[in-house]
């Protein structure tokens, strides 16, 4: 005998008038004398199961009475359409099998503090809003990979353990690697995915990345996921066009397939419907002027001298002036990574762009045209104080058939936070890793 249910909540409309078995967990229960209403969730949705005392055995009614929040059970009954019911359908209960009891479930309908909920993250993911956020996360990841695959990209997996820093920073998690010294958890797969680009033309990597940054902002995690495409024979303008098509396709897919989850989150869908190409573009110079002209509108967005990078308040201020994501391009080379191609007409700035999401969500993509001249790349490695011997393999990519190429990295959690309207990034990943959190 199979333990699998004969239907799911997501497919219940196909079974009106039929006898089915559902399997799931009790989300909520209401007793009204001889009637017991069980709101059952099965991972695909929720449905109201109506237990009428006169229609079931004494044992079944007693089981219904004994069910508590998050008890697991199998419920058999007849499917009935009812506009008044949550989701438009109900199950008239005939039999209930208690599979796993739940005693004093800690997350109750009352308000709980964030620390309590994070300590119980393994249970919190069952709640309606967390379920909706993580459903949308899964959709974003699927949409991103499927779109790239359809565009002819090849997934190219890159190592998580590396011998060097990709971006020349000290914010690395280190571990001992046998007799070879230190290894580091990858900050990005970009350098390695460039090798794949030389083989396949259009590639991407997808996986976890790690930053040992002592930051406690609502935008930062120490472990997060990135998808990083790289394209041969592509310049800075090609790169921005690819990004706006990519992001727009992801948002459209979520609107098409996860609209009900967005409603659970009370997301203003009209704002997402505006996310269509082309995205506005401003230069770093223009952004500096914009910040100076609108100082005081966003707390902490004080005027910046030319040459300084933006903080979160500056990104919020810039993005507030646009109704969709905005590119800020041509940053000073000094505040960007060593591998970014200088503008040939103005070498002090790089052919790069950050894509800022509206509504205060900040940078969701960082990208650039890469340096393809081996001599210039070697100069930049030295100028950043990096050990040349650590990057010989990376220089080889320029020594043997170099081509202009571009790419970008998109942080999954920041995109999910923006699309779902989630204020803090910790809710956009199943088990967030932060400065003061590594449990559960």
From Swiss-Prot:
Gene label: asnS
TM region positions: none
Xref: Pfam families: tRNA-synt_2, tRNA_anti-codon
Organism: Chloroflexus aggregans (strain MD-66 / DSM 9485)
Coiled coil region boundaries: none
Catalytic reaction equation(s): tRNA(Asn) + L-asparagine + ATP = L-asparaginyl-tRNA(Asn) + AMP + diphosphate + H(+)
Superkingdom of the source species: Bacteria
Catalytic class of the enzyme: ligase
Xref: CDD domains: AsxRS_core (cd00776)
GO MF annotation, one: asparagine-tRNA ligase activity
Designated name of the protein: Asparagine--tRNA ligase
Subunit details: Homodimer.
Subcellular location: Cytoplasm
């Amino acid at each position: 005998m199979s333990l699998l249910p004969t239907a799911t909540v997501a497919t219940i409309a196909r079974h009106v008038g039929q006898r089915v078995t559902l399997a799931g967990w009790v989300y909520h229960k209401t007793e009204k004398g001889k009637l017991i209403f069980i709101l059952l969730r099965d991972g695909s949705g929720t449905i109201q199961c109506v237990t009428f005392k006169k229609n079931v055995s004494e044992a079944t009614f007693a089981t219904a009475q004994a069910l508590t929040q998050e008890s697991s059970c199998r419920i058999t009954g007849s499917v009935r359409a009812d506009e008044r019911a949550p989701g438009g359908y109900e199950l008239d209960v005939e039999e209930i099998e208690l599979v796993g009891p739940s005693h004093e479930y800690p997350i109750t309908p009352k308000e709980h503090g964030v620390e309590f909920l994070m300590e119980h993250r393994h249970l919190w993911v069952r709640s309606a809003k967390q379920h909706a956020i993580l459903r949308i996360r899964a959709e974003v990841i699927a949409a991103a990979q499927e779109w790239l695959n359809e565009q002819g990209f090849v997934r190219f997996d890159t190592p998580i353990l590396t011998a060097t820093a990709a971006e020349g920073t000290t914010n690395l998690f280190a571990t001992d690697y046998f007799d070879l010294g230190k290894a580091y958890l990858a900050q990005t797969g970009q350098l390695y995915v460039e090798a794949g680009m030389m083989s396949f033309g259009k590639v991407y990597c997808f996986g976890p990345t790690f930053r040992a940054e002592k930051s406690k902002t609502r935008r930062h995690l120490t472990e997060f996921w990135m998808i990083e495409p790289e394209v041969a024979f592509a310049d800075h303008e090609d790169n921005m066009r690819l990004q706006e098509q990519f992001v727009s396709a992801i948002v459209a897919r979520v609107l098409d397939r996860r609209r009900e989850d967005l409603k659970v989150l009370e997301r203003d869908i009209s704002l997402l419907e505006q996310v269509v190409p082309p995205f506005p573009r401003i230069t770093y110079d223009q952004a500096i002027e914009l910040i100076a002209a609108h100082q005081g509108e966003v707390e902490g967005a004080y005027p910046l001298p030319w040459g300084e990078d933006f903080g979160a308040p500056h990104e919020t201020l810039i993005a507030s002036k646009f109704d969709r994501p905005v590119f800020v391009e041509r940053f000073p080379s000094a505040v960007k990574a060593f591998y970014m191609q200088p503008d040939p007409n103005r070498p002090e700035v790089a052919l790069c762009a950050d894509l800022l999401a509206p509504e205060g969500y900040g940078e969701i993509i960082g990208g650039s045209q890469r340096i393809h001249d081996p001599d210039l790349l070697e100069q930049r490695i030295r100028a950043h104080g990096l050990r040349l011997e650590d990057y010989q393999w990376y220089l080889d990519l320029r020594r043997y058939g170099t081509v202009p190429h571009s790419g970008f990295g998109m942080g999954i959690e920041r995109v999910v936070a923006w699309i779902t309207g989630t204020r803090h990034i910790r809710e956009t990943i199943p088990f967030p890793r932060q400065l003061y959190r590594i449990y559960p």
